[in-house]
């Protein structure tokens, strides 16, 4: 098997859209990157499953991963689409599976779905998720998988 390479699509998490003021224009820039990757030799495009910027939360736009993945899947035709990685703590396993299966159908089988235990405490608390210790989060992750 030959190596495969993917590219992260800017989505705001890493302060990579701050030079564009309008969120609609930010999304257009994301689509442009995705389409360029789709027309190149890249195997996949990726977005982060985060809600706030890093290293510090700001008021800048961060696009939600699953909604973005669904939209980019419809804007592209060949390239695989994935999240790096889905946070188990943000969605019950059954909701994660339902969402993933929907995006997989929308992409005609081009979804890469990853799952992790989560680490960004600020996001958990900001959205009302209980922040637990690592053993508890890992236990929930094992149960979900």
Residues covered by each model-derived region:
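N-terminal beta1-alpha1-beta2 module of alpha/beta enzyme domains
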Residues: 1-75
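Glycine-rich "substrate-gating" loop/helix at the edge of Rossmann-like oxidoreductase active sites
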Residues: 57-60, 86-91
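Residues at helix-coil transition
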Residues: 74-77, 108
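Flexible, glycine-rich active-site loops centered on histidine and acidic residues
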Residues: 4-25, 88-145
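Hydrophobic residues within beta-strands of alpha/beta enzymes
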Residues: 45, 81, 111-113
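Conserved catalytic cysteine-centered active-site region
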Residues: 76-84
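Short linear capping/connector segments at secondary-structure termini
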Residues: 50-53, 84-87, 128
């Amino acid at each position: 098997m030959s190596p495969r390479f993917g590219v992260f699509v800017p989505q705001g998490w890493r302060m990579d859209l701050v030079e564009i003021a309008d969120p609609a224009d930010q999304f257009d820039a994301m689509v442009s990157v995705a389409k360029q990757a789709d027309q190149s030799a890249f195997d996949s495009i990726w977005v982060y499953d985060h809600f706030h910027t890093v290293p510090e939360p700001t008021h800048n736009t961060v696009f939600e991963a699953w909604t973005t993945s669904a939209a980019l899947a419809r804007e592209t035709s060949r390239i695989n689409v994935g999240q790096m990685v889905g946070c188990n703590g943000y969605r019950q396993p059954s909701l994660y599976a339902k969402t993933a299966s929907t995006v997989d159908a929308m992409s005609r089988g081009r979804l890469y779905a990853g799952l992790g235990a989560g680490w960004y405490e600020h996001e958990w608390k900001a959205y009302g998720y209980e922040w637990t210790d690592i053993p508890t989060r890992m236990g929930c992750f094992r149960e979900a998988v």
